[in-house]
Amino acid sequence: MLVAAYAALMAVESLVLDPLAAVPGATLEEIHAYLTAAGDDVPSDIAWVIATASIGVVLAAATAIVGVWRRLSLSTLAIVFLAIVAAGAVPAFLDGFRLNMDIADTYGVSGGAHTVWAGVLYLTSLAAFGAIIGLGVYKLHRRAKMTTLA
């Protein structure tokens, strides 16, 4: 669920929120039309963002299936799901080089993030990385405790 929410926010931020913030007062249709008239391939940019957002969801679904099939522990599954979210910072950053850079070049605005939502994605990835470390320490502590009891 967290992976799907992250992917959805990543796509909405890249495709809707950031373009609207970069060009205040314009609609998405107007932005896309202006970019297309300038020679940018907007459908390709949109497809790229959707594809990169979908990769995490597919990885999470595959992890769930393999986890049930191989009877992986909940903590192991949590670590893998958190790793997918932590790694999401990379495609979230790279998505900015498609549509957002076209907007920056065409409209003469900054190519950086124009909303706080990119930061939310990065901080979520950072928190997921921290949670991986915490779960790893927990698993090691638990394993050591079980070994001393045996």
Model-based region annotation:
Residues A4-A8, G56-A61, L82-A89, L123-I133:
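Hydrophobic alpha-helical transmembrane segments of multipass integral membrane proteins
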Residues I50, L74-A78, V116-L123:
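Alpha-helical transmembrane segments of integral membrane proteins
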Residues A37-S44, L72, S110-V120:
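Membrane-interfacial loop-to-transmembrane-helix junctions in polytopic alpha-helical membrane proteins
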Residues A60-A87, H141-A150:
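Cytoplasmic juxtamembrane regions at transmembrane-helix boundaries
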